From Swiss-Prot:
Gene3D superfamilies: NADP-dependent oxidoreductase domain. Keywords: NADP, Oxidoreductase. CDD domains: AKR_AKR5H1. The active site is at 57 (proton donor). It is an enzyme of class 1 (oxidoreductase). NADPH binds at residues 197, 235, 238, 246-247, 273. Belongs to the aldo/keto reductase family. GO terms for molecular function: aldo-keto reductase (NADPH) activity. This is Aldo-keto reductase MUL_1987. InterPro entries: AKR, Aldo/ket_reductase_CS, NADP_OxRdtase_dom, NADP_OxRdtase_dom_sf.
Length: 282
């Protein structure tokens, strides 16, 4: 373990299927194979145990190589991947899960998500049926969705009679997803945030930097802590080992209510990723 690194493993959050998931982990979107292997290896050495990938990222095999090389027992790891829109459908989504397992070199993943609802395609409910089948066959421990609106989540529950364990969505102070978080909570669905650092757009924000100064923390740590204190699970992206150490070191302080409120006040609905209502998916 690197000097000064936090102790292994973030706290865990309970899912609605009796499984648990670390509240904080690292994603590998946009990373090349080499970058992925280095980042995942560094994250695991530092103590991170949740790694988030997707078929659409094209780097599942690189994640698998880093996992295998780590020597960490499989039971201590939490691996998430996602089905691409091209594989929406009952049979196709189940088969896509098996293909992801082959690329990852794993017998199962801990969480399998529908990457995008792609409502214009109209197959996300069928795709979730395939995820239910994959879970039943032991290909994945938990199943969930990503980028789903309240309407999409409700449709899945109403039509399959199964509630997703997780809804992973873009969530940061500029887009705090208050209504969606409440809706997820009503369904006992964990909200998991991605793009929590708003692509660096808040690194120099006066509100954030001022609060960071009061706690002796970095703006990044404050943004991650804010997200966690909302009750969310969080996925950050980084290929820098030093940044990964800093990002994981957010459990030894707590933001006061006035500072939470100040950061909440930055919400203006700015979406930095695609709109789930119109995006055709990946």
């Amino acid at each position: 373990m690197m000097p000064g690194a936090p102790s292994p493993s973030a706290p865990s959050i309970a899912l609605n299927d009796e499984n648990t998931m670390p509240v904080l982990g690292m994603g590998v979107a946009g990373l090349s194979d080499d970058e992925t292997e280095r980042a995942v290896s560094a994250a695991l050495e530092i103590g991170c145990r949740l790694i988030d990938t997707a078929a659409a990222y094209g780097n599942e095999a690189a994640v698998g190589r880093a996992l295998a090389a780590s020597g960490i027992p499989r039971a201590e790891l939490f691996v998430t991947t996602k089905v691409a829109t091209a594989d929406h459908g009952f049979t196709a989504s189940r088969e896509a899960c098996k293909a992801s397992l082959d690329r990852l070199g794993l017998d199962y993943v801990d969480l399998y998500l529908i990457h995008w609802p792609a409502p214009a395609v109209g197959k996300y409910v069928d795709a979730f049926g395939g995820l239910i089948q994959a879970r039943g066959e032991g290909f994945t421990r938990s199943i969930g969705v990503s980028n789903f609106t309240e309407e999409h989540v409700s449709n899945v529950i109403d039509l399959t009679f199964v509630t997703p364990a997780v809804n992973q969505v873009e969530l940061h102070p500029l887009l705090n997803q208050d209504e969606l978080r409440k809706a997820n909570a009503q369904h006992n669905v964990v909200t998991q945030s991605y793009t929590p650092l708003a692509l660096g757009q808040l690194a120099d924000n006066p509100t954030v930097t001022s609060i960071a100064g009061e706690y002796g923390k970095t703006p990044t740590q404050v943004l991650l802590r804010w997200n966690l204190q909302l009750g969310n699970a969080v996925i950050f992206g980084s290929s820098n080992a030093e940044h990964i150490v800093t990002n994981l070191d957010v459990f030894e302080f707590e933001l006061a209510s006035q500072h939470m409120d100040a950061i909440n006040g930055l919400n203006d609905g700015t979406r930095l990723r695609e709109d789930p209502m119109t995006f055709a998916g990946v």
